[in-house]
């Protein structure tokens, strides 16, 4: 059975274009995988930023963790497990000031963990999360996908590749201020064309 992990990250909640787009992508995937399990995580509802306590918790052996460290590690491990168990990731990438939202960066920090999602070898890093697919819902008011102003999509593609997820598609509803209806129509066409 297919497991789909949906990651929303917009602070606009239900009004977010990226949320509408992740839903459309999810609907398209469910047409092909009607029995899929869907796991959703809304990062705007909160995800811990990594800090010294987080680092100390996840890299301390479980039997040596304090009670506080156990709680921190439990949450971090749950985020990691969601990605490990997913076959397909649907990730909202709303662009804020040319980059990704802070909460999406925090999620990436949770999943880019040495020994869990990648290892270092003599020849360089090797991602461990292979065999997965990611579909990214890229939305922006004025930043075109892939332009020199876009510091979000290349970053996310690189991070996903670093952890082993190299099958990555982008569906864009970009430059919304220059024609929201046209941007959404292009995005809808891209969703319809996705190989589910």
Curated annotation (Swiss-Prot):
Highest rank taxon of the organism: Bacteria
Keyword annotations from UniProtKB, A to Z: Flavoprotein, FMN, NAD, Oxidoreductase
Keyword NAD: yes
Cofactor, how bound (note): Binds 1 FMN per subunit.
Single GO MF annotation: electron transfer activity
Catalytic activity: 2 a quinone + NADH + H(+) = 2 a 1,4-benzosemiquinone + NAD(+); N,N-dimethyl-1,4-phenylenediamine + anthranilate + 2 NAD(+) = 2-(4-dimethylaminophenyl)diazenylbenzoate + 2 NADH + 2 H(+)
Binding site for FMN: 10
Self-association and partners: Homodimer.
Biological function: Quinone reductase that provides resistance to thiol-specific stress caused by electrophilic quinones.
Similarity comment: Belongs to the azoreductase type 1 family.
Name used for this protein in its record: FMN-dependent NADH:quinone oxidoreductase
Organism: Cereibacter sphaeroides (strain KD131 / KCTC 12085)
Native organism taxonomy: Bacteria, Pseudomonadati, Pseudomonadota, Alphaproteobacteria, Rhodobacterales
